[in-house]
């Protein structure tokens, strides 16, 4: 591992431990050349995914881009970062174990929406508005109607 301070390749791992959900390994490192201490994170990657964009282009899957888009939809919402990280890890794991090395951006978007729907309704609507390219207020009303209908069905099931 290259030292971010002096660019030396001579570093040592001082401490290694998994995160709470064991999806990431946190390593505390020290540079032998300058004694700079830094932390790295390692994540298991089951397979290389390629995203097929709507215009047909193929690009490598970027977990960080997925995380950024989810975080944008959750901006100013009271959702713990650990829950967001766990949700994104779950989504990535589902995509990696789905059997296909190439996956359409539509499948990724629908998977994210499915998970956001259970995490935070407002984030779900925000993400849907960008992903589904809402053009008018009716588009928002339709999604809100879906959410209201699901809530009414859930309450009716509880009452029975």
Curated annotation (Swiss-Prot):
Q: Which Pfam families match?
A: ATP-cone, Zn_ribbon_NrdR
GO terms (BP aspect): negative regulation of DNA-templated transcription
Q: Where are the zinc fingers (unnamed)?
A: 3-34
Q: Where is the ATP-cone domain?
A: 49-139
Note on how the cofactor is bound: Binds 1 zinc ion.
The keyword DNA-binding belongs to this UniProt entry's keyword annotation: yes
Q: Which UniProt keywords apply?
A: ATP-binding, DNA-binding, Metal-binding, Nucleotide-binding, Repressor, Transcription, Transcription regulation, Zinc, Zinc-finger
Its transmembrane ranges are none
Polar residues bias located where?
1-11
Q: Where is this region: Disordered?
A: 1-20
Molecular-function GO term, any one: zinc ion binding
Instruction: List the cofactors.
Output: Zn(2+)
What family does the database annotate?
Belongs to the NrdR family.
- Purpose: Negatively regulates transcription of bacterial ribonucleotide reductase nrd genes and operons by binding to NrdR-boxes.
Q: What is this protein called?
A: Transcriptional repressor NrdR
Organism lineage = Bacteria, Pseudomonadati, Pseudomonadota, Alphaproteobacteria, Hyphomicrobiales
Gene name?
Answer: nrdR
């Amino acid at each position: 591992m290259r030292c971010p301070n002096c660019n030396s390749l001579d570093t040592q791992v001082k401490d290694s431990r998994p995160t709470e959900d064991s999806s990431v390994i946190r390593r505390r490192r020290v540079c032998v050349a300058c004694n700079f201490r830094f932390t790295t994170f390692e994540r298991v990657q089951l397979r290389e995914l390629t995203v097929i964009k709507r215009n047909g282009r193929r690009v490598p899957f970027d977990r960080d881009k997925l995380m950024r888009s989810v975080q944008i939809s959750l901006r100013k919402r009271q959702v713990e970062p650990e829950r967001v990280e766990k949700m994104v890890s779950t989504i990535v794991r589902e995509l990696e174990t789905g059997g296909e090395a190439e996956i359409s951006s539509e499948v990724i978007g629908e998977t994210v929406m499915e998970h956001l729907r259970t995490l935070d309704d407002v984030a779900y609507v925000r993400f849907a508005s960008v992903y589904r390219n809402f053009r008018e207020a009716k588009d928002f009303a339709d999604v809100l109607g879906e959410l209201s209908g699901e809530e009414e069905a859930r309450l009716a099931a509880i009452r029975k």
